[in-house]
Amino acid sequence: MTSKRALLRMQRSWAVSQGLTPDTRGYLAEVAANLFRPLSARALAAFEEGGGAELKDRPSAPAKLKALHSSAALAVNFFDYWIDRDCAPLLEALGIHGSLRAPLEIEGKLPIGLTGNPPNLDVLLELNSRALIGIESKFTEWLSRKRPSRVLFKPKYFEGGVELWSRSGLPRCQSLVADLVSGKEIYRMLDVSQLLKHALGLAVNSRHAFSLYYLYFDVPCPASKTHNEELRVFGDRVGDELRFVPLTYQELFRRLSASNRADGDYLSYLESRYFSS
């Protein structure tokens, strides 16, 4: 059994233990059944503004947030709890110094002036210093190898020969973009093009410092070695420019649990759902 299948089986076992009945694809009947608590008003509005695919069933598939393997559901279960609470314990667990200027955002939107919708960050924080912290969440996605033939960047990112990343103070990122497009550099497990788009959004929308977090659910397996090596290579190339912070959900949960400043029901839910062996 592959590591991804083992992870999906773990989620299915959790659902059954809660009296839930996932379908053959791992989707629950209702979004609420997949969450620690109902979506906050702010998170609900953010998902609705994003087109509704996370919340509404489609002809081809149920709403994405119904999936036991949903990365968005994982992020919501970790972060939406803090949207109306003192976030000091969360910031401490993330290694962030300072306090929030505004409530954290689920599905943070960072327009960059191009046509179409920019990719949403799973979580967006703005500190009192005006620094922006973007968090990209991954659950099972990184366990699937990326297709070499896929289009990494749409033509709009290069119209008129403008170097968007360099113009936004990210010359190392611009160099990496060029190497990706030419095929000089290839990443098999890490979705580097998505991270570079998020970095551009943060740079365009922040007049002060910003940082990009890559928060992922680690699974010991051969793919993890490749993934971690690609994280190292990416960090070596552009990490300083982005203040890039890779962090596992396992480590974040460990830090939150050790702080003794989070609600017991919240921690118990996360432990039984994601971290019980």
Language model feature labels by segment:
Residues 123, 138-149:
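A short, conserved, highly charged catalytic patch centered on acidic carboxylates
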Residues 144-212:
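Acidic, metal/cofactor-coordinating or nucleic-acid-engaging core segments within structured domains
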Residues 109-114, 138-142, 202, 217-221:
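Short, solvent-exposed loop/turn segments at secondary-structure junctions
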Residues 132, 154-173, 262-277:
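Active-site cores of enzymes that catalyze phosphoryl transfer or operate on phosphate-rich substrates
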Residues 124-134, 203-208:
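Active-site beta-strand-loop-beta-strand hairpin of nuclease catalytic cores
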Residues 12, 188, 195-277:
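Non-catalytic C-terminal interaction segments of nucleic acid-processing enzymes
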Residues 1-111:
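Nuclease-adjacent, charged terminal/linker segments that flank catalytic cores
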